[in-house]
């Protein structure tokens, strides 16, 4: 297969990003908004993702302010739905750039994260699996559209097409199917079989007493969330492209804070307002920009489609394998 040069790769990245965001905005009726690069500290707005990852923080001494770099914008977006008075069944999306300093680095994990962060205003009565599945299918169709257009533009990629439909499976059903496997092994097995899956229910304990994966307790409802995972034929592995979910309401927030021993968060501004029903009900998520490009362009390493910071061993390994990191 022909390998794109660095310049050709940069052009292809722009092509994919332009195509995806236009179709995402149209399909979900999203308005583009400007994402913050810094957030106020100690307000509960930033996300600790799996519950333990700490954001990069700083103090501007001369200005008397302190801030932190976003890790994701899940809670910020929900606040903005209200602040911007976004109508029902419309939403927002932003180009989110984040630093996750505690990330374990790999060929698909970087401390730099770029994604389309989106949030859609829904009714409380729409907080259900049917709503979740409808939105997942729309996003999956856009991923398939992008794959078709990329393969048309770069003809040597015209192989290993994603299936027409995405397969839904709950994390509990996945556990029952592969009881002696780890969650990551289960993901690999189910992705290799169906090529595109959405695993429902991430964060809460399963019947074996452990969660499929960790999720912070204060943005997704653990019963109504999940991940879009595809089979990456280039690397023969499962690849998560998007994490999304129906957001917590005033009841599920309290339940999940209690389950995760995070009741102290009820005193933070964001959590107080949510418990008092001051924010719109919503569904939202993030779609990895670099991951999508990495997948569609058949790359070996995420660093081929994004500029980040890498330790010496990863740089040496890439050079040895003739992988050109940006």
Curated annotation (Swiss-Prot):
It is found in: Cytoplasm. GO terms for molecular function: aspartate-ammonia ligase activity; ATP binding. Pathway: Amino-acid biosynthesis; L-asparagine biosynthesis; L-asparagine from L-aspartate (ammonia route): step 1/1. Coiled coil: none annotated. It catalyses: L-aspartate + NH4(+) + ATP = L-asparagine + AMP + diphosphate + H(+). GO terms for cellular component: cytosol. SUPFAM superfamilies: Class II aaRS and biotin synthetases. It holds the Pfam family AsnA. InterPro entries: aa-tRNA-synth_II (IPR006195), aa-tRNA-synth_II/BPL/LPL (IPR045864), AsnA (IPR004618). It comes from the Bacteria. Its main location: cytoplasm. This is Aspartate--ammonia ligase. The lineage of its organism: Bacteria, Bacillati, Mycoplasmatota, Mycoplasmoidales, Mycoplasmoidaceae.
């Amino acid at each position: 297969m022909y390998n794109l040069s660095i310049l050709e790769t940069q052009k292809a990245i722009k092509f994919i990003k332009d195509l995806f965001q236009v179709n995402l905005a149209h399909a979900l009726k999203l308005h583009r908004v400007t994402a913050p690069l810094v957030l106020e500290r100690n307000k509960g707005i930033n996300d600790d993702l799996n519950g333990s990852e700490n954001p990069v923080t700083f103090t501007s001494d001369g200005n008397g302010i302190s801030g932190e770099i976003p890790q994701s914008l899940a809670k910020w977006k929900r606040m903005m739905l209200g602040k911007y008075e976004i109508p029902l069944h419309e939403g927002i999306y932003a180009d989110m750039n984040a630093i996750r300093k505690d990330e374990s680095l790999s060929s698909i994990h970087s401390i730099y994260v770029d994604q389309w962060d989106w949030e859609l205003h829904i009714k409380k009565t729409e907080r259900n699996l049917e709503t979740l599945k409808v939105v997942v299918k729309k996003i999956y169709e856009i991923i398939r559209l992008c794959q078709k257009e990329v393969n048309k533009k770069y003809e040597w990629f015209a192989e290993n097409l994603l299936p027409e439909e995405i397969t839904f499976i709950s994390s509990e059903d996945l556990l029952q199917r592969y009881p002696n496997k780890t969650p990551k092994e289960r993901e690999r097995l189910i992705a290799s079989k169906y090529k595109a899956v959405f695993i429902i229910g991430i964060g809460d304990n399963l019947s074996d007493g452990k969660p499929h994966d960790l999720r912070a307790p204060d943005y997704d409802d653990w019963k109504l969330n999940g991940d879009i995972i595809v089979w990456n034929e280039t690397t023969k592995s499962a690849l998560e492209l998007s994490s999304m979910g129906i957001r917590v309401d005033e009841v599920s927030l309290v339940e999940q804070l209690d389950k995760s021993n995070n009741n102290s968060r009820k005193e933070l501004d964001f959590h107080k307002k949510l418990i008092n029903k001051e924010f719109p009900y919503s569904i939202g998520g993030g779609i990895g920009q670099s991951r999508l490009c990495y997948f569609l362009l058949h790359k070996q390493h995420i660093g081929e489609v994004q500029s980040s910071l890498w330790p010496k061993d990863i740089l040496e390994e890439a050079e040895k394998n003739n992988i050109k990191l940006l």
